[in-house]
């Protein structure tokens, strides 16, 4: 069936939306693919829905190819299963919560590990039923604090989530790698540039976890990689290579110095290099201690101190990942007033440990390393405080920023950073959820076997924006043929009746051959039609213009910009060959 622009429910815009920040947000609205309804909530118009459905179909094909079976669970969920796993609390404010008329707590589902585990428990009881992979393509809901970038980070989004269930860890690993391969095929078919990185599991739980990140300067996720080895990881998952412990014997004794008004690392370093210490001091020789209060889900606030080398900032994402599922806040004025042993700007390990404050340090703070740090009195710091001799931390924490040039955890070279957009995440959950719901089946030996579970997600609606981010140009969208709303866009740029009739005939013949045709039969000017064709982004554009009288039309490649004249008599064959 030919789609006529004169009848299509679409309105293009010439100007970018005032609140749009990234190219995909601007272009998808300008081209009439989506429309905003509320912050983080969008309507899908016909063009956008066509692209979304094509991506969904690619995902379904590859999921079916690894033995996945599609089901559909409700988005409106009861509280009880999520209370059992504590995620009703762990998800905090990101959950959309509501009550029914009987005052029962309900929620809009952000993810479905619990429900899939319960579904399998209710249907299967023997090892003979496994392995099994179930999946759904469904709308999810998360109450993002700051929805942004259009459909890249919304509060309502379409996601493919699949779950594997096996009777052994080997089976889980096989399902995990099957999904990993399927995801690579999916993203390859979409023509995406992406990288697979080691990741943290967060509130999902489990052991092994990897993210698929589409490379983009507008991405919210920072990842690092080692060019020499191919190592790649989300910054939250980078493990700092700890230096070897150093001998303590013979090291200078710790001495407290009057340092004056030196509450910052910069002022402390200036003092140290003018104090006659006999060496040049840099920020890396200092140890700064950050005070937080942390609270486990359902628990009370507790103090936590984090010590990092003074040349490093604390990375909020790494800190949050290290503390998850606990929430945390920096101490404020009222908190410092409550704990007089905490002298802001001069906090050191001694007072922290003496007052029972949990103290975690960067992995670089190893036994035998010597530091300049606070002496717990105004205007005083201690020089040559040695880890393992003068203080012993309660443990380590991966909270310091990761920088370009840092050594790769695999020892093969240096790290370089880039930005990306998360498009997929795979987890080996293990038995976190099957333990919670006692999902056992009868094993081959007649004894109960606890199932092991994997979880695998793809942001389907987000992929629409990601393709737009990677493939657009200054003129508009450029859709790969696999997901383009149409195969070819036929533009009638000649008012001659014969030319219009020829365009109709060409469109009809292409349609008969099974191609999806968008025909611009509007009475608008050629300039308006050309701009819209470039904005809408169909990969092949056929222009029926002034050359019609000479027996030629134009075939334009939206990706390369190349235009070639083709004979009217060969038009169907030439366009079909180009479309492939």
UniProtKB/Swiss-Prot annotation:
Keywords: Aminoacyl-tRNA synthetase, ATP-binding, Cytoplasm, Ligase, Nucleotide-binding, Protein biosynthesis. One of its GO terms (biological process) is prolyl-tRNA aminoacylation. GO terms for molecular function: aminoacyl-tRNA deacylase activity; ATP binding; proline-tRNA ligase activity. Signal peptide: none annotated. It catalyses: tRNA(Pro) + L-proline + ATP = L-prolyl-tRNA(Pro) + AMP + diphosphate. Its main location: cytoplasm. It is found in: Cytoplasm. One of its GO terms (cellular component) is cytosol. Pfam families: HGTP_anticodon, tRNA-synt_2b, tRNA_edit. Homodimer. Belongs to the class-II aminoacyl-tRNA synthetase family. ProS type 1 subfamily. Consists of three domains: the N-terminal catalytic domain, the editing domain and the C-terminal anticodon-binding domain. This is Proline--tRNA ligase. It comes from Mycobacteroides abscessus (strain ATCC 19977 / DSM 44196 / CCUG 20993 / CIP 104536 / JCM 13569 / NCTC 13031 / TMC 1543 / L948). The gene is proS.
């Amino acid at each position: 069936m030919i789609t006529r622009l004169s009848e299509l429910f679409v309105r293009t815009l010439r100007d970018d939306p005032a609140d749009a920040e990234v190219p995909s947000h601007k272009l998808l609205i300008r081209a009439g693919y989506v429309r905003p309804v509320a912050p983080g909530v969008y309507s899908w118009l016909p063009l956008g829905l066509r692209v979304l459905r094509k991506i969904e179909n690619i995902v379904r094909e590859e999921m079916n190819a690894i033995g996945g079976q599609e089901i559909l669970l409700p988005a409106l969920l009861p509280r009880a299963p999520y209370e059992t796993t504590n995620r009703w609390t762990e998800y905090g404010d990101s959950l959309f919560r509501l009550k029914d008329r009987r005052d029962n707590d309900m929620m809009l589902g952000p993810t479905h590990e619990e429900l899939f585990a319960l579904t399998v428990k209710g249907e299967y009881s023997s090892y003979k039923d496994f392995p099994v992979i179930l999946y759904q393509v469904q709308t999810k809901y998360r109450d993002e604090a700051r929805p942004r970038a259009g459909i890249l980070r919304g509060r309502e989004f379409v996601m493919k989530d699949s779950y594997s269930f096996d009777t052994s860890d080997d089976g889980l690993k096989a399902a995990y790698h099957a999904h990993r391969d399927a995801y690579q095929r999916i993203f390859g078919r979409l023509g995406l540039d992406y990288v697979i990185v080691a990741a943290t599991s967060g509130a999902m739980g489990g052991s092994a976890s990897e993210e698929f990140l589409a490379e983009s300067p507008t991405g919210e996720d920072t990842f690092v990689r080692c060019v020499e080895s191919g190592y790649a990881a989300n910054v939250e998952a980078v493990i700092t290579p700890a230096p070897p412990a150093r001998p303590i014997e013979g090291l200078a004794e710790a001495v407290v110095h009057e340092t004056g008004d030196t509450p910052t690392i910069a002022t402390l370093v200036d003092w140290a290099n003018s104090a006659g210490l006999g060496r040049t001091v840099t920020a890396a020789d200092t140890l700064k201690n950050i005070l937080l209060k942390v609270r486990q889900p359902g628990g009370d606030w507790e103090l936590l101190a984090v010590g990092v080398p003074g040349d490093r900032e604390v990375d909020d994402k790494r800190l949050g990942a290290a503390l998850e599922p606990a929430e945390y806040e920096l101490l404020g004025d009222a908190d410092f007033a409550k704990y007089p042993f905490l002298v802001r700007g001069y906090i050191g390990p001694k007072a922290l440990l003496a007052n029972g404050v949990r103290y975690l340090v960067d992995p670089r703070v190893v036994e035998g390393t010597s530091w300049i740090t606070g002496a717990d009195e105004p205007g005083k710091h201690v020089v040559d405080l040695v880890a393992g001799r003068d203080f012993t931390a309660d443990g380590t924490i991966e909270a310091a920023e990761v920088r370009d040039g840092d050594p790769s955890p695999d020892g093969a070279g240096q790290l370089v950073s880039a930005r990306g957009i998360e498009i997929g995440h795979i987890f080996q959950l293990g038995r976190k959820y099957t333990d919670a719901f006692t999902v056992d089946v009868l094993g081959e030996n007649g004894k109960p076997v606890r199932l092991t579970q994997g979880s695998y997600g793809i942001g389907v609606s987000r992929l629409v924006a990601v393709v737009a981010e990677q493939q657009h140009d200054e003129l508009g969208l450029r859709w790969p043929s696999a997901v383009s709303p149409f195969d070819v866009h036929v533009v009638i740029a000649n008012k001659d009746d014969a030319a219009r009739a020829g365009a109709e005939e060409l469109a009809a013949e292409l349609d008969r051959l099974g191609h999806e045709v968008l025909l611009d039969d509007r009475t608008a000017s050629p300039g308006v039609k050309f701009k819209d064709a470039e904005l809408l982004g169909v990969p092949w554009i056929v222009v029926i213009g002034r050359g019609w009288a000479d027996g030629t039309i134009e075939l334009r490649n939206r990706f390369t910009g190349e235009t070639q004249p083709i004979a009217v008599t060969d038009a169907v064959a030439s366009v079909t060959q180009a479309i492939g």
